[in-house]
């Protein structure tokens, strides 16, 4: 089996880039995952100027997200996604990327699930029935569009003050580019989704997310070759041969491959460091989970499907990735003429063979013939929405099994570039630090694509969790320090 870097980099725009909807939930409970707060370097005179503006995401602590994407930890299988996608008594239906076993963790997966759920509802609903949809992300929006067009009475409730969920577009004062702190690029999208993006008037620009500029802590450019891909392939093959599923971290150790657990922060280039950088720019951004959490069998696809890994790699090399000028209009266009209630936090859903009801945190409730639930897996795992009666065992098992990963972005705008702006130097929009102790090691340079001096820092899994508790000033110090190896030294 061959796992190429490009396999994961089509998802590097997806780990946070191709996220899905946010739903409705009361205040966030204490998270079960904890990671030590990232160290903040001592500020020093640096060739990297202070950004003139920044926008940071906080999906891991967002009360209506509780994570960025779903993943399969040890013991979970794609069948758990299929189980969660099943309806209950033809009254309660589920959608969202976590329910899509073909394209989980992506906009396409969210789209697929919304289309599927709308079709399932239409197959059993009578003419003009009232359908309640919980969550105004992409899955909820496309389902609402399909059901309204089919003549159903659709009411969509969303906890936020806006639609879109983890499609979150803003354009703050002073920014000439749209800032998507959630889904920021489109990769691997099917024809229907791409057509809807264009129909919504969303501008797109091709962006090559496969080419990477790998740099050592001293600023020297590295040729990392296939070290990371080869080690991951070896680990997955070893894991697939075991009698039971083991964490990906254990598969690295057991296979004899270069082990990212042996990487030493700040040590510079080395095989373990190359593998760690490969995972930081790939698996961590597509799953939001660390090797110690990911299933070696299913965490990165089906490890037993030795003939499909190269096919995945080839598919990811298609020049289909595009940077958009903001994805929010996509959701807005889908919800045109749909009845949407914002700031409506759902606290309970009741159902029986006769119908369903939706209870809001305000104490109000309303009835519907059927309910479509599109909240993220992180929200479902909190039991914040109480189902009465409780969901069937298969659904509860699936919710417990599927993980909620964390991926964050940090958008930085500079008055001028401090990096080498020569054509050869900026040909790769992806930057990766190898063997660095920096808190943010993966970056996207938008200057070659947009002409604007904007960088996006990407962090996933434990790296993302370690930055959550930092203040804005602390995070900026971490970011500026991390970017020093990319700065041009005067003279």
Residue ranges and their predicted role:
Residues 2-491:
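FAD-dinucleotide binding site
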